[in-house]
Regions:
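Structural preference for beta-strand elements that scaffold enzyme active sites
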Residues: 2-6, 46, 74-78, 98-101, ...
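Active-site-adjacent beta->alpha loops and helix N-cap segments on the catalytic face
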Residues: 3, 54-70, 84-90, 104-126, ...
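Short secondary-structure boundary segments
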Residues: 7, 51, 104-105, 129-131, ...
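Conserved, mostly hydrophobic/aromatic
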Residues: 8, 39, 47, 92, ...
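Conserved anion-binding
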Residues: 11-12, 18-23, 90-93, 97-172
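N-terminal beta-alpha supersecondary unit
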Residues: 14-60
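Short, acidic/polar
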Residues: 28-40, 84-90, 145-155, 206
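Catalytic cores of alpha/beta
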Residues: 73, 77-99, 181-216
Length: 238
């Protein structure tokens, strides 16, 4: 199971939100690059970066912080937040990002994902499927679409997407445990590389995800609140 330590950026700082609410923010570090170095030194082999300002603005906002992270670590980095066009994807890949996560645009115009996969290849493009009560959410989680998360995932598969980051918004940043039944259902029904996100709080959660053969998991607040030791998690599950 691939572990992805999360680094969420807002105003150039490393932060965590609770349930995706922008008025519920905790700042963990003034320098995202320092967090990236720390996680890599503790065994991280892939990092998950989120440009929260970008998610709201609809374009990349934290490029200097992203550039600094990439200059200091040698492991692959996936990035989400504010990537809404092929030009955005190209700019981020040119910076050195390994995989771009497309969220809002994937739900609003799924066929756009086919264009991206054809242009950049399936290993470079990830669909960010964010769900609220089973419905796909868009625009920095401020709105829900008319599609279920499963319908969106099946559409993504049809268009050549191989990687999905599935986030249960109601659990994100809450440390209440991930939505394992739904995540497992998505992985089994789609056959895609489903990366679980939202609510992971303990080694027990990782154990359950691993037992359910979930291919990957993003760990955020649990690392920052020291509920999960990354070296221990890497040794046990990766």
């Amino acid at each position: 199971m691939q572990l992805y330590p999360a680094i969420d950026m807002k105003d150039g700082k490393c932060v965590r939100l609770t349930k995706g609410l922008f008025d519920n923010i905790t700042v963990y570090s003034d320098t995202p690059a320092d967090m990236a170095k720390l996680w890599v030194s503790q065994g991280a082999t892939f990092l998950h970066l989120v440009d929260l300002d970008g998610a709201l603005a609809g374009h990349s906002v934290n490029a200097p912080a992203i550039r600094e992270v990439l200059s200091l670590v040698s492991v692959p980095v996936q990035l989400g937040g504010g990537i809404r066009s092929a030009e955005d994807v190209k700019a981020m890949l040119d910076l050195g990002i390994s995989r771009c996560i497309i969220g809002t645009k994937a739900a609003e115009r799924p066929e756009f994902m086919r264009e991206l996969v054809e242009a950049f290849g399936p290993e470079r493009i990830v669909a960010g499927v964010d769900a609220k009560d089973g419905m796909a959410a868009v625009a920095g989680w401020e709105k829900t679409s008319s599609m279920t998360a499963l319908e969106l995932c099946m559409k993504m598969k049809e268009y050549g997407v191989r990687h999905i980051v599935y986030t249960d918004i109601s659990r994100d940043g809450t440390l209440t445990g991930p939505n394992i039944p739904y995540t497992r259902m998505l992985a089994e029904k789609t056959g895609l590389n489903v990366i679980a996100s939202g609510g992971v709080s303990s080694m027990e959660d990782l154990e359950t995800l691993s037992e359910n053969r979930i291919p990957g998991v993003i760990i955020g607040k649990a690392l920052y609140e020291k509920r999960i030791s990354l070296p221990d998690a890497v040794a046990r599950f990766q």
